[in-house]
Amino acid sequence: MPVHEIRHPLIRHKLGIMRRADLSTKSFRELSQEVAALLTYEATKDMPLAPASVEGWCGTVEVDKITGKKVTVVPILRAGIGMLDGVLSLIPGAKVSVVGVARNEETLQAHTYLERLVGELDQRLALIVDPMLATGGSMVAAIDMLKRAGCREIRALTLVSAPEGIDAVLKAHPDVQIYTASIDQGLNENGYIMPGLGDAGDRIFGTTQKHAE
């Protein structure tokens, strides 16, 4: 299955706290990173291993070592930055590519305005992070950009997803795996996920008075 809704108790609990409208910016930001780390754990479960040896306190010890493609983490600006540290806490050696995608609030269409990608993308696994998968336009645009640059193995990590966004991504890119903490009911007339989390970017960066505590 290309879609993985991770219903681990820790994720369910933390996401439930994040849905509170009165949650502080600090708490929302910290929980975004924690859930991102838990999603990363699930999204990398099939990484290949190879035997290796190290010198331990009692001599040579046989261990396992991750092999295969290197990783690049790809936050979609700006909200994806809120998940970046969570991923890097588990894969600290990963290179970071940055994609800027904006959505026209009238047409709901996405357009890219920034591209800062690392090299050798054809040899890397890309983990795209964006808290909200709503219409899917931003995610599709980011995947388009990565594939044009040569990346062939891409996985998307989101906190909350709408069925409409999932369908849009899989229609455009059926080879992409989606890992999400929750598949919510759907979109409202303004293209926002219901019940969702509100505007994740505003809540992570504290750019609205309501969540700026």
Swiss-Prot record:
Residues binding uracil: 193, 198-200
Annotated organism of origin: Bordetella pertussis (strain Tohama I / ATCC BAA-589 / NCTC 13251)
Pathway assigned to this chain's UniProt record: Pyrimidine metabolism; UMP biosynthesis via salvage pathway; UMP from uracil: step 1/1
EC nos: 2.4.2.9
Needed co-factor(s): Mg(2+)
Keyword RNA-binding: no
Annotated signal sequence range: none
Designated name of the protein: Uracil phosphoribosyltransferase
Annotated PANTHER family: ADENINE PHOSPHORIBOSYLTRANSFERASE, URACIL PHOSPHORIBOSYLTRANSFERASE, CHLOROPLASTIC
GO terms, biological process: UMP salvage; uracil salvage
Role, per record: Catalyzes the conversion of uracil and 5-phospho-alpha-D-ribose 1-diphosphate (PRPP) to UMP and diphosphate.
Activity regulation info: Allosterically activated by GTP.
Keyword Magnesium: yes
InterPro entries the record matches: PRibTrfase_dom, PRTase-like, Upp_B, UPRTase/APRTase, Ura_phspho_trans
Positions annotated to bind 5-phospho-alpha-D-ribose 1-diphosphate: 78, 103, 130-138, 199
Record key words, sorted: Allosteric enzyme, Glycosyltransferase, GTP-binding, Magnesium, Nucleotide-binding, Transferase
Cofactor: record remark: Binds 1 Mg(2+) ion per subunit. The magnesium is bound as Mg-PRPP.
Enzyme class (EC, first level): transferase
